[in-house]
């Protein structure tokens, strides 16, 4: 009813935190929560200032939110730039090392074109003592052994969140510090991601069947290898090898093991690892600062909408003119 409520004011009412929170409280259905229109939503009481004030509030919020959204977009662009920088630092270090102007040699492999002349190039299987698929049994919400899944591998690290459990597992499938996990089945843009397991809990942990464990041998440092496996060049080729299916791709261990990797001497691996840990930590620190700024702007946007549509903040013509 346009004679009673301005459409943009109604939009901001429906987008306000208090309205969304009430909807969440009333929602029913486990798989697809929903709210009923005639018996629930239609019964909500909305704040209804005079129509001219509604339009003034909507105009003020349109301009204010557009400015906030532009600031957030600029900061997200900064995050994209930092992500590209992080990836380029890793890609260069694992393929050329950290010395300036190394003497290079050509190599005939799938994703590598040249490496420092004193480096080796070998297949993944040559630096791995064993490869194991994870458990294929059903998990439960509570149990003895936490189970890592594909969602627990993020940005080259393992996140111990949203864990499922099982009560029994073969001892051979308990993870040890230095074990690498790669995601053999996932969406085309996520398959192949890897992480190193570092034991930081007292309980034994295992892993699900969509993950493959690589236990390295004496030729490679697991954390250096993790940088290689997550480098843009290696991942791009690995994903080309993955077999697509409906919304998923599969990269089996046989194909993965055949891929080539650069292999510097061990001391150089450790030097590259130290360099990358320092550089990526610096980038990650800036990323965290920018993300905190985005979170602050997002929270302010929600708060501003809430205060304006509930009357906690009165919007005058002078307010609208000041931001026009």
Question: What name fits each language-model region?
Answer:
Residues 8-12, 21-28, 153-165, 180-207, ...:
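Short, ligand-facing micro-motifs at secondary-structure edges
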Residues 5-8, 28-55, 203-211, 220, ...:
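A short glycine-rich beta-alpha junction/loop motif
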Residues 275-289:
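Amphipathic alpha-helical coiled-coil segments
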Residues 29, 168-169, 245, 288-291:
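Short, solvent-exposed loop/turn positions at domain surfaces
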Residues 3, 37, 137-147, 160-175, ...:
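Short, surface-exposed loop/turn microsegments at beta-strand edges and helix-strand junctions
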Residues 107-108, 122-137, 151-180:
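Sequence-specific dsDNA recognition surfaces
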Residues 51-55, 66-67, 106-135, 258, ...:
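Non-catalytic DNA-recognition/assembly elements of restriction-modification systems
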Residues 66-117, 289-321:
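Short amphipathic coiled-coil heptad-repeat segments
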